[in-house]
Amino acid sequence: SWAVRALGCKAGIVCTASHNPSKYNGYKAYGADGCQMTIEAADIVLSKINAVPMFGGAKLVDFDEGIKSGMIEFIKQDVIEAYLDEVQKQQIHPEVCATSGLKVVYTPLNGTGNKPVRAILKRIGVSEVTVVPEQEMPDGHFPTCPFPNPEIKEALHLGLELCKTVKPDLLLATDPDCDRVGIAVPGKDGNYVLFSGNEVGAMLLEYICKERIALGKMPKNPVAVKSIVSTAIADEIAKDYGVEMRNVLTGFKFIGEQIGYLEAAGEADRFIFGFEESYGYLGGSYVRDKDAVIGSMLICEMAAYYRSIGVSLLEAREAMYK
């Protein structure tokens, strides 16, 4: 989503394992706006695909030959660094993580999150990060769990076991294509408590609203967006802070579509947060898709901020429900 926009591409394709069993791959198609294609655009593309003869209709090129000819180019590091710059700009309290002493256990579940998540945490000052060793390196066979989905407790087994010895303040787990992130925090009995996507989404919304208002960083007529199946608590939080909540169909592309509407009106800065209950979060309009890199950053910042005022994430969750 970022690279399509940054490089001025007409479209983008992601072949992804996502959170599915290893025998499956996903295929995500993005438009020039960096948003996954909505129904209308997808129908047009599908009609073009169906018109291509099954045998011999597609022109093929050898991958190595494509590299040699310059037809295929790898994204350079400056594109990645520019992306991380934009993520980092979405911080609300930039100083809080470096002074918090926050301790994190992280697992990318053998997916793609290892480098970007650790890079952003290092940038914001979270220095005590322990990665689950068996799940650190990319492996499309996902040998440690049949379903590498952070929504499923079994996928977090190794991370939770490591928590018993490291005793972190926070466990982060990103799915293989690093667009969703799950968390667990220490409970009162010493065991780690998993939060739902609805809970994290609502807590992030409340944190963003409260702290942006306190710091004078809230835009005029702010907008948040969530899927219609996500918690109604977020609607109440938005109402309390004077934020317009837009509810859209399931699928983050519809949240991205709303950001596009705001951008077309010259009002992209009105967008403050978007989420869906399946652990997908986005703060800022720099991309048009859910992003576990900024999700991880904001969760760590929120945890560090509450820690700085003597409140745990468990206590913050309880206060939200009250």
What is the predicted function of each stretch?
Residues S1-A32:
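Ferredoxin-reductase
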Residues K164, P168-L170, T174, G190-V193, ...:
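Phosphate-binding and adjacent anionic-ligand microenvironments
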Residues S1-K10, N149-D169, E257-A265:
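Conserved phosphate-binding catalytic cores of ATP/NTP-utilizing and phosphoryl-transfer enzymes
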Residues Y30-L60, N198-P222, K226-I237, A292, ...:
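Glycine-rich phosphate-binding loop plus the immediately following alpha-helix
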Residues N25-L162:
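Gly/Ser/Thr-enriched, mixed-charge loops and adjacent short helices
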Residues Y24-A32, D179-N198, A234:
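Short Gly/Thr/Asp-enriched flexible loops that form oxyanion-binding sites at enzyme active sites
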Residues Y106, K122, L158-T174, V181-P186:
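Accessory "access/gating" subregions that flank catalytic or transport cores
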